[in-house]
Amino acid sequence: MSNERVLICGVDEAGRGPLAGAVYAAAVILDPQHPIPGLADSKTLSEKKRDMLAIEIKQHALAWTIASCSAEEIDEINILQASLLAMKRAIDQLTIMPTQVLVDGLHCPGIAIPAQGIVKGDSKVQEIAAASILAKTARDHEMVEMHARYPQYDFAKHKGYPTAHHLRLLAEHGACEIHRRSYAPVKKVLGLV
């Protein structure tokens, strides 16, 4: 019997659907000695609850990292590849090497560690739920910062997602530097379709 400690790393991304901003990924190794109550898929939590849990995760996890791929990278390699690259970057930055990586969804990044995709993993696996919370809060924070740079797009409100409000502002002001030019609504505004 092996004495090797099993270290599960949960990985998830945030921001595949928005028309603007980076896609974020987080990798989290939770400490079994410090369980964090209330972990759940970030999409089911209020912003306030996500922010509180993100602080707890950062304080109590054995290791955590957050990485991203820019809108420009998304346009160059497509959103799936950019999501996987952000995940790989997050895993590569870990200070502790996990024994297994569990990823939300079907696709796993190309890494040397055994990895498994779990559909709806953010609602089934605590480590993935923790990663989903860190990725979502980091991305939301970035979009609030982008709101300060580009107030005419109201990014703090819709976080770059293709809401009717965002689409109207996009049509009114055109695309800015952080809009994803490979996405159909942005292409339409730029006259590329």
Swiss-Prot record:
Domain of life: Bacteria
Reactions catalysed according to its record: Endonucleolytic cleavage to 5'-phosphomonoester
Cofactor descriptive note: Manganese or magnesium. Binds 1 divalent metal ion per monomer in the absence of substrate. May bind a second metal ion after substrate binding.
Keyword vocabulary terms for this entry: Cytoplasm, Endonuclease, Hydrolase, Manganese, Metal-binding, Nuclease
Binding positions for a divalent metal cation per the UniProt entry: D12, E13, D104
Keyword set includes Nuclease: yes
Cellular component aspect of the GO annotation: cytoplasm; ribonuclease H2 complex
Broad class of where this protein is predominantly found: cytoplasm
Assigned EC number: 3.1.26.4
InterPro entries found in the cross-reference section: RNase_HII (IPR022898), RNase_HII/HIII (IPR001352), RNase_HII/HIII_dom (IPR024567), RNaseH-like_sf (IPR012337), RNaseH_sf (IPR036397)
Names of the cofactor(s): Mn(2+); Mg(2+)
Family: Belongs to the RNase HII family.
PANTHER family recorded: RIBONUCLEASE H2 SUBUNIT A (PTHR10954), RIBONUCLEASE HII (PTHR10954:SF18)
HAMAP family, per database record: RNase_HII_B (MF_00052_B)
Function comment: Endonuclease that specifically degrades the RNA of RNA-DNA hybrids.
The name this protein goes by in its record: Ribonuclease HII
Organism in which the protein naturally occurs: Methylobacillus flagellatus (strain ATCC 51484 / DSM 6875 / VKM B-1610 / KT)
Highest classification ranks of the organism: Bacteria, Pseudomonadati, Pseudomonadota, Betaproteobacteria, Nitrosomonadales
